[in-house]
Amino acid sequence: MMSKLDNQQLAKIRTMVPEMRRVERIHFVGIGGAGMSGIAEVLLNEGYRISGSDLAPNAVTDSLTQKGAEIFFGHAAENVNGASVVVVSTAIAQDNPELVAARELRIPVVRRAEMLAELMRYRHGIAIAGTHGKTTTTALMTQIYFEAGLDPTFVNGGLVKSAGTNARLGCSRYLIAEADESDASFLHLQPMVSVVTNIEADHMDTYGGDFEVLKQTFIDFLHNLPFYGLAVMCVDDPVVRELLPRIGRQIITYGFSDDADVRIVEYGQHAHQGHFTILRAGKPDLNVKLNIPGKHNALNATAAVAVATEEGVDDDAIIRALLEFEGTGRRFDHLGEFETGNGSVMLVDDYGHHPSEVDVTIQAARAGWEKKRLVMIFQPHRYSRTRDLYEDFAHVLEQVDVLLMLDVYSAGEVAIPGADGRSLCRTIRGRGKIDPIFVPTHEDLPSVLANILQNDDLLLTQGAGDVGKIARQLADLQLDIAAMRAE
């Protein structure tokens, strides 16, 4: 899937953004995050000097260092010395010493999305937005374009497994990018094609707690398209459907709905593989096999198909790409089948942290492995989200057979009374369907699992915090309870 660019191709790419030739060194504050690291990697491959800082090393910073970036651990004013521009993520506080120093030195400070917008400015940009499904849809579209020989640049919010990275510099005019609505920074982007997968109440602090403001922001995002641009929108989502009359751009809709322009029919699932047919006006029906489970992933794939079809990608390339798709990191990530006593347990890790995301993950697990007992380790993400969606979480989580509840991963937030894992556990228990177990520390998990796991269980680790590290620890130890206790 990947090829290395030669010097001539790199020189051609550098001419795409002529004014960026004035820039020598680009410094990223918070470079270890998925969104920041992707842009840093593309710019590094374009030949720019890249530096960055983060609190601690991780696999991402190790990879960037190997590719030539200079990484500092800890934030210090001197880290920005010599930088032409400083790029910041929304997680960085305004009193961060590197931001303070950059302002004092009159070094331009830009947000992540502004730098992504510069990468997109002279390319054919395809931006994927929505509350859920952005990362997988971006990865699917990337796979299709590679299979068609179009060699796109891509910047994704998660690992594209077939590429082994979340970002890559291509030599064509196409740039496929995940567009982040969490801080409304996707309004900086000016793509040629925009996808909206769905719209739900999330990151509401950004929008003053007003859902109408969030909806208007998505409308504004779509109106950043040129008049000849294309909006691809999921008509199954009630909020997206509501907004359709307010969009003054060409629209193609997709979904299971009868009135979708690009429509899914005859969906079925066997274990990890979904199979369905996509109907398109004036085009042959596409009989699709997709190696990731769930109707939500059929929707993600159909969004990618709608864009690819509109841009003339060959049907055979589309079908091959979807069949060969390996998935994205931490999205129903099958980590293995592990022997435990008299049988085996299937381990799956998933990033979903909104009630709707957790719900579709549960449904995918039930559809593909209906005879397995579903055991979930759930880690709530952010106190504010837990508070705002408390009853929705309680309703969704009671659908599993066994629930192990961790405490909230704060993501830097101050604790909110009553919006914690123990309280949520108590509420779910009071609803009477299941008897969840609150696990106060990660170190307590092995002994709890030793008493819980049974032959042929499906163990699902769920959440956007460090529960993913727990999943990989469990996989590394092959669910050996004794070994986990020793750890």
Swiss-Prot record:
Q: For ATP, which residues are the binding ones?
A: 130-136
Pfam families with a match to the protein in the record: Mur_ligase (PF01225), Mur_ligase_C (PF02875), Mur_ligase_M (PF08245)
User: Which reaction is catalysed here?
Assistant: UDP-N-acetyl-alpha-D-muramate + L-alanine + ATP = UDP-N-acetyl-alpha-D-muramoyl-L-alanine + ADP + phosphate + H(+)
Where primarily located?
cytoplasm
- Please name the Gene3D superfamilies in this protein's record: Mur ligase, C-terminal domain, Mur-like, catalytic domain, NAD(P)-binding Rossmann-like Domain
* Disulfide linkage: none
Entry GO CC: cytoplasm
**Keyword terms, alphabetized:** ATP-binding, Cell cycle, Cell division, Cell shape, Cell wall biogenesis/degradation, Cytoplasm, Ligase, Nucleotide-binding, Peptidoglycan synthesis
Q: What does this protein do?
A: Cell wall formation.
Full protein name: UDP-N-acetylmuramate--L-alanine ligase
Protein species of origin: Photobacterium profundum (strain SS9)
Species lineage: Bacteria, Pseudomonadati, Pseudomonadota, Gammaproteobacteria, Vibrionales
